[in-house]
Amino acid sequence: MKFLNLIIKYRLLLGAIFLVFGIIVNLEAGFWPSFVLYLIAAILIIGHFLFGPMRLIQGYMEEGDMEGAQKVIDSIWFPGLLIKPVRSVYFTLKGNLAMANQDFETAEAHMKKSLSLGMPMKEAEGANKLQLGMLAMQKGNMREAENYIRQAIRAGLPDKENEAAAYLQLCSIMINKREFRAAKEYFRKVKKLKPTTPQIADQVKQMEKYISRMPG
């Protein structure tokens, strides 16, 4: 994995080196002896612009190194050249970084751009819509938040932690609408999923105190 990450990190540089060697061999011995070098150079350079360093960005984000992730994403000079599914992931990652920096307007714009391009997997679409729902809640737009979160659940979410977060947000929205029976039903779904993420688990504890005093 580390070797693959190194290849991805230095893919453009390696492509340029192979291209230079290819030109030298071509001048010294002709085209066919240099063909393999040209081919490797083409694969590396084209791969850099079509697929980008998404694997590196995700690695940094999983480690919590947002600064490292930002540096890598800023190194993508021509995002328009990325193939469509990769470009969608690119805008999702930009949205995640903007959210981490509390720049919610920019995050929303990037997430919507990602959705408009089409997500490579249904679970990714669900996670994207869940984040848009949470952004709408940040702005106090409960109707839009509910709409996005319901769409996220229908599309499918990558794991039980995301599912629990979605149902917890719906529970909060129902409380805000004073639909207490629906709120309790969504809270039961959250409890059934048994989330372990500290932030979600803490929210569940806080919500449980409120739910126990709720009518309906």
Predicted regions and their residues:
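Transmembrane alpha-helices and immediately adjacent membrane-cytoplasm interface residues
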Residues: V36-E63
